[in-house]
Amino acid sequence: MGRTPPRVGLNLIDEEAFRVAALPLFEAGLVDALEVDIDNEWGASRGRIDPRPAWQSELLDVFAEEDALYGHGVWFSFLTARLDDRQRRWLELLAEECGRRRYRHVTEHFGWMTSGPFIQNTLFPMPYTRGAVELGRDRLALLAAAARCPVGLENLATALGPADATEQAAFLADILAPSGVLLLDVHNVWTQAVNLGLPAEQLLLGFPFHLVREIHVSGGSWFQPEHTADRRAVRMDSHDGAMPRGEVLPLLAMALARCDQLEVVIYERRGLLGTEAEREAYRADFRAVRAAVDQAFASAAPGVEDAA
């Protein structure tokens, strides 16, 4: 008897272009689950609430009632060493949101982006040390207390050197080992591999697959440095471009074959959805992800022997 296939869903984007692009997928019944940037209303504003459009709130409520809603934090700054008032307020608002709607689990980004009064929206890695692991476990406990549901982390795309990529899997495993959830982003794995000249498959195989409950699949873009000696293009996990299928889908297939606790696969894309051609490319990428999942779990369907 095969494994239960995961849900396949979308990350909700706060843009009208997303609503137009994704509507045919919802209408066709292809979206099993919804993930939302759970702190989108208040994360960047130091606690000031910026309410969502009504159509978004209604959509969140529908998926929460179906027990198919997932939360993803952006602005907490998980590994900032000194918890500040903004983060304490963030935790209070997370608790309020998780009391309002039921989430299957809530994840945050690995790394840090806040120092004192500065909020930097580029996440930075942290050296893998015992102190950093203890800090991560403490922050994970704070998330769990606020969310009152399973919580976890997403692997980071940025790296300042090879060790940030090669040690990340063990680093995450040490933090999450007690009770945490790993959100495995395969585009992030490929991004680190490309930028550092490392084999993506080898990086992927280091992750603790038994902790993976969610997978992210996305696209991104390339940045061309202008004022550095090294003029190589840098891959960014910016979600603003089509999915590089030839590179990312094989990594997805590898992960699908190994993640026994996998619950959901989410496709992410934001921006550049203004034309019908861009919207159709978005839908085609989602269908490609869904097809990859269906293919990987084809053996889960009852076969002739089961029917007999």
Give residue ranges: language-model regions.
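Active-site acidic/histidine proton-transfer and metal-coordination neighborhood
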Residues: 86-182
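Acidic (Asp/Glu)-rich catalytic clusters
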Residues: 23-30, 48-71, 88-104, 141-146, ...
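Conserved, mostly hydrophobic/aromatic
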Residues: 34, 106, 185, 215, ...
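A short beta-strand-loop structural module common to alpha/beta enzyme folds
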Residues: 32-45
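Boundary/entry segment of secreted carbohydrate-active catalytic domains
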Residues: 1-22
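C-terminal helical cap(s) of enzyme catalytic domains, especially alpha/beta-barrels
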Residues: 276-303
